[in-house]
Amino acid sequence: MRKTKIVCTIGPASESIEMLTKLMESGMNVARLNFSHGDFEEHGARIKNIREASKKLGKNVGILLDTKGPEIRTHTMENGGIELETGKELIISMDEVVGTTDKISVTYEGLVHDVEQGSTILLDDGLIGLEVLDVDAAKREIKTKVLNNGTLKNKKGVNVPGVSVNLPGITEKDARDIVFGIEQGVDFIAPSFIRRSTDVLEIRELLEEHNAQDIQIIPKIENQEGVDNIDAILEVSDGLMVARGDLGVEIPAEEVPLVQKELIKKCNALGKPVITATQMLDSMQRNPRPTRAEASDVANAIFDGTDAIMLSGETAAGSYPVEAVQTMHNIASRSEEALNYKEILSKRRDQVGMTITDAIGQSVAHTAINLNAAAIVTPTESGHTARMIAKYRPQAPIVAVTVNDSISRKLALVSGVFAESGQNASSTDEMLEDAVQKSLNSGIVKHGDLIVITAGTVGESGTTNLMKVHTVGDIIAKGQGIGRKSAYGPVVVAQNAKEAEQKMTDGAVLVTKSTDRDMIASLEKASALITEEGGLTSHAAVVGLSLGIPVIVGLENATSILTDGQDITVDASRGAVYQGRASVL
């Protein structure tokens, strides 16, 4: 079962209900809407289709609104484009003009105050470089020298590496888009070009004004200033997106992999989800198969510890959107098989602080690995418990049971967490019982599996203080167990020694009213023994201990309840008999 989550950008190639259904079936967990393009009508229709497709499949698919952000762009060019030549001077004006080979203008009037002689200005995603020769604040102009030939077309992006620009945290357009997202009930906001913690707080204030504090903020780190201020940004954020496109323009390309690793590591330590984004399977916009480098890129992001991997143009406008998701699913699934979960847990343990929830999270992850648990099941009010366990990357899947569908969708971004809808409970026992049942319904857990359950106080979030090891199964009978062993096998019901001798086979579970010395030969073949007669000093108890097999005595009507050939598991430590094979300690 794949733990890494897949984020897909929805666009013209993927906006239909039919295509969205295929993407979800192929592995999409979160749908991203890029508000750099499209209007409210388009995005509203896409949100409606996403909800309809997810309802049809019964899946909790999150919706992420990606803002355009406070970017700098050029204005229009003469004849739609100009040819810039190496060594020629080019004036950048703060007043809008139609661009020529002598002068162009930009959308950000404050640029003249932010750059200085020697600064570098990059145009069109870094394809054309300019060196600042002089700044004339009075004329509102920047004199530059063109560093390489290139064609500059209308409204291209402008980057200023190493310069702290005084753009606002969010633009008026961003604010309108976010309010629209609130009205539509999106789950995540991914603000672009976040440079400092105050940028995030501006957005949080806007969410609070509209009573939408539950929407999570996943800032996109796309420049050096954002990298430098990462600790403060993370403190006020719910996660992070490593947006390698603009980041690779703002900082040297050779630094991007190192920054990616560092940002992922910081998110992992805090238990906050991190998305690795941009050009992951870029060639699949045109080709049905990825390059080997792209496959390695996806795998290495998973080895770094990313929670989610993102597709952009591949699913928004590419020719092979479904194949791209399937490819990402296959690479992620195979990469996860190669992870050393014990080593990851050991490293994470040394990287984080210690709260009660952290202590429980660590213990749960350790216990699940040591007992080879089939799953970790956690009833959760806010999703916090599930996230705190997920940060230790246990090998077992985490089934988070919550009554809140919004929390289920937000957990769609967290590695290894699979959310299920639960019911309100009035007591801890009721809550745990419901969680076990929902984990069975999910298909992740089946009867006989050993699971680790963790939870807190009913109705209170952030109070995780309980851990329980539990065998999921139909307990069909209980008596008094002798010893701590367990065994699995077919039942042989015998009323006396002669019948036992005739029917017993190696590895069968002998079920009888009582035993005596005439049954010793049959007992030596048995994997376990169950008697109706009770008593810790009974013949069955003493012989069972001497033979080293699990024994349950005092099980009322055992010879009537159990039938010949019935496969059961005998758990002496609990005195329980399970239907079928059960994973017991």
Curated annotation (Swiss-Prot):
Its EC number is 2.7.1.40. It is an enzyme of class 2 (transferase). PANTHER family: PYRUVATE KINASE. Its cofactor is Mg(2+); K(+). Substrate binds at R32, G245, D246, T278. Keywords: ATP-binding, Glycolysis, Kinase, Magnesium, Metal-binding, Nucleotide-binding, Potassium, Pyruvate, Transferase. ATP binds at N34, F35, S36, H37, R73, K156. GO terms for cellular component: cytoplasm; cytosol. K(+) binds at N34, S36, D66, T67. InterPro entries: PEP-util_enz_mobile_dom (IPR008279), Phosphohistidine_dom_sf (IPR036637), Pyr_Knase (IPR001697), Pyrv/PenolPyrv_kinase-like_dom (IPR015813), Pyrv_kinase-like_dom_sf (IPR040442), Pyrv_Knase-like_insert_dom_sf (IPR011037), Pyrv_Knase_AS (IPR018209), Pyrv_Knase_brl (IPR015793). Pathway: Carbohydrate degradation; glycolysis; pyruvate from D-glyceraldehyde 3-phosphate: step 5/5. Pfam families: PEP-utilizers (PF00391), PK (PF00224), PK_C (PF02887). It comes from Bacillus subtilis (strain 168). One of its GO terms (biological process) is glycolytic process. It catalyses: pyruvate + ATP = phosphoenolpyruvate + ADP + H(+). Homotetramer. The keyword tRNA processing does not apply. The record marks K220 as: Transition state stabilizer. This is Pyruvate kinase. It comes from the Bacteria. Mg(2+) binds at E222, D246. The keyword Kinase applies. Belongs to the pyruvate kinase family. In the C-terminal section; belongs to the PEP-utilizing enzyme family. GO terms for molecular function: ATP binding; kinase activity; magnesium ion binding; potassium ion binding; pyruvate kinase activity.
